[in-house]
Each structure stands twice: as structure tokens, then as C-alpha cells.
Amino acid sequence: MFNSVSLPLTIPALNKDSDSKYLFECLLAPSALTVFVVSGGPPGAPPPTQNTPSGLVGLSGLTALRALRQGVPPCGIGPSARRLAL
């Protein structure tokens, strides 16, 4: 579903929580904040799925990074992502 992309050089600098999930906050609209919880799973994981009505989305491995590169604005680590992480 996703094409191969060049992954950003900043991946090693992303914060991980104790469950090895990358935590992102992405501003998708002027008043809508979507939080991504990115697992360190293998490449070829399923595309993103909506886990909760609040906008929490679970992504896995390189699929998540491809999704972030292909249509999601630049993301930053934020405290609300850690609070909302499953």
C-alpha cells in the first residue's frame, strides 16, 4: 500500500517509551491534534488504524515512518503523546 521512501535521518533521535514505541504529535488541522504511537515492529506492518475516537493511531515499524513521510506534517515529541499512549 505504501511506496518505498527515504526515511528521515532523524529517526535514531526519536524518543522511545519503555515499550519501545515512538511517540509523535502531529498537527493535522488547525484545531485537530492526532497522536501517533509507533511500534518498533518489522517492515511491512499493516497500515495505520484508528484505535480510539480521540485520534490515537497505532502504527508499526517502517510502515508508520512511510505514512509519516507521505502525508503527515512534521511531528514532534510532546507530553500529551506520552499521556495518551496505550
Curated annotation (Swiss-Prot):
It comes from Beak and feather disease virus (BFDV). This is Uncharacterized protein ORF7.
